[in-house]
Design a protein with these regions (language model features):
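Internal, well-ordered alpha/beta segment that forms a basic, Gly-enriched binding/recognition surface
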Residues: 4-123
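Hydrophobic, aromatic-lined core segments that form the binding pocket/scaffold
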Residues: 67-238
Length: 238
């Protein structure tokens, strides 16, 4: 540490060894400080909702256009990086990208980790059997591990999934991801990883994650129809 920067110089700053540090006070204009405190205290979303109505329409539209362009560039850069990582495999890149978006922010990283760990060549051999796809997807996610489900909730179907995954795991020498990566707090039930994975099972089984089908969709309605996923019967009540 070579410099301590603060808003108010009210004490001597020292390192862990006791050495005094040079300090720099940066004065913040009162209106900026007030806006900062107001934004931090605001519980409504978005916090800036009081300010936006007072801005010129052209300013707001310009800001939104810039944000849209930045977001698209960010998404394109991520896809380019995935495409390089998969050595130009558009099918796998599409699957990973779709999975990441099923995480809806909170579980985006976990879903991407899961998709990167998903051997699509192995899954493809069992694609026509939705139960085997389900066992493979949930098993690779670590969600069939005993520690992830209370003993009283391990019903016959769950145990059957576990057994099937053990078979597939041995057959393809698989290693599941760390289930601790999944987040459940402050999520609505429909956004739980189990539900989103069950939807991925249905989409994959019905070949609606195929890159060729998605890019050949002619209309927004057709694309929405392809991505309109339901869950397998078991997960409708779990």
């Amino acid at each position: 540490v070579v410099l301590h920067v603060c808003g108010v110089l009210d004490d001597t700053a020292r390192t862990k060894s006791g050495r005094a540090l040079p300090q720099l006070q940066i004065d913040v204009p009162q209106n900026i400080a007030d806006n900062y405190r107001e934004l931090l205290a605001e519980e409504a979303f978005p916090p800036c909702y009081r300010v936006i109505p007072n801005l010129p329409t052209l300013t707001v539209h310009g800001w939104l256009n810039a944000l849209t362009a930045e977001r698209l560039n960010e998404k394109c850069s991520r896809i380019d990086a995935l495409l390089a990582r998969t050595e130009g495999d558009w099918e796998r890149t599409c699957f990973i990208t779709m999975a990441r978006n099923f995480g809806f922010g909170v579980n985006s990283e976990a879903f991407e980790t899961w998709a990167l760990n998903m051997p699509l060549s192995a899954a493809g051999k069992h694609r026509d059997d939705v139960f085997q796809v389900e066992a493979l997807f949930f098993g690779q996610a670590g969600l069939l591990n005993d520690e992830m489900v209370k003993e009283e909730r391990r019903d016959a179907y769950f145990l059957k999934l576990q057994k099937e995954y053990r078979f597939l795991k041995h057959k393809f020498s698989l290693t599941p991801m760390n289930p601790k990566l999944w987040r459940f707090l402050r999520l609505r039930p429909q956004n739980f990883p189990h539900i989103r994975l069950a939807q991925m099972v249905e989409l994959y089984h019905s070949r609606r994650t195929d890159f060729s089908r998605l890019i050949n969709a002619k209309t927004e309605g057709e694309l929405r129809g392809l991505l309109n996923a339901k869950v397998t019967p078991y997960w409708e009540g779990h």
